[in-house]
Amino acid sequence: MYIAIISDLIGSRELADRNKAQQALHSTLEQCNENFKDELAARFTITVGDEFQALLKPEANPFHILDWIEFHLETLNFRSGIGIGEITTDIIEDRALGADGSAFWNAR
């Protein structure tokens, strides 16, 4: 069993400086990946625009990690889906792309 997180920024289309927001998201997720590397099965990855996702190991605490991201993004708000389930494909550890299974289905 794994824990999938799928998130996106709220109201990003209305941001005055989308590039600055994207840079803040990227640097926050890179720092998060380093800080929580032992809990991640696949690193946080920006997928499309302002969406990001990760795959956590079963013992990880997704709420702790999401709270950390929220604190470090400061003024940027986001929403997340959390899914617990199986992964039926190979897991690429350095990015949360290409994986499939009920963990991601449930997070949507």
Can you say where each PLM-predicted feature lies in the sequence?
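Regulatory and interdomain segments flanking nucleotide-handling catalytic cores
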Residues: M1-R108
